[in-house]
Design a protein with these regions (language model features):
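Extracytosolic ligand-binding ectodomains
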Residues: 1-203
Length: 203
């Protein structure tokens, strides 16, 4: 996450929710202006330490060693808390460079900019969530408002039924909607992955 108020809020919210679900955060890395992103990622994945050990062995034996630097092995996924597509496009290639390219990467929808197919290719493989309407081919800026209007109209017709019947779902344009007994509307988004620079639904 970036060293900013947004980054702190996102990390706190994610840590709280992940811990409530029984998850464990092995390490948390903050991107600051004091170090380059490359140095920060290298330190976080311990590839610099691995490279240093190889150099020490080569120095001790006065001969090259047929070995490749490795990342730490206690990670099973990466959560990239990026507020912008640009930041995510800079970090994703660095993960690949530092031998973490095969780890699943998850991120908020702030990383994705519809209609930027070529630029989005650096984000290929990242998984996130989007409203169903955002997975459509139409990239009009008015589309989110149109989708919200459609769902609002549909909820008006089924609001009381959804509130009184537990488990009722409305498969709307902005996500899967439900209403609790207090009348609060809950929304579940669609899982997506970036492939060939475009968001694709995860089936």
């Amino acid at each position: 996450a970036p060293d900013s108020a947004w980054g702190q809020r996102m990390h706190s919210a994610f840590n709280t929710q992940w811990s409530a679900l029984g998850g464990d955060i092995t390490a948390m890395t903050t991107l600051t202006s004091e170090l380059s992103d490359n140095e920060t990622i290298a330190n976080s994945l311990a590839t610099l330490q691995s490279e240093s050990r190889i150099k020490e062995i080569e120095k001790a034996f006065e001969a090259p060693v047929d070995s490749q630097a490795r990342r730490r092995t206690d990670l099973d996924s990466v959560v990239l808390l990026s507020p912008t597509p640009q930041m995510a496009r800079e970090i994703r290639p660095l993960l690949r460079f530092h031998y973490a390219g095969k780890l699943p990467v998850y991120a908020p929808s702030t990383i994705y900019q519809n209609g930027s197919g070529i630029a989005n290719r650096d984000l290929n493989g990242i998984q996130f969530v989007l409203p169903a309407s955002a997975l459509a081919t139409d990239s009009s800026r008015s589309q989110p408002l149109h989708a919200l209007g459609l769902d609002a109209a549909a909820l008006i017709d089924h609001f009381d039924q959804a509130r009184e019947t537990t488990g009722t779902l409305l498969f709307g344009e902005t996500g899967d909607l439900s209403v609790d007994t207090m009348g609060n509307v809950h929304r579940r988004l669609k899982p997506a992955v970036i492939a060939r620079g475009k968001a694709r639904a995860v089936l």
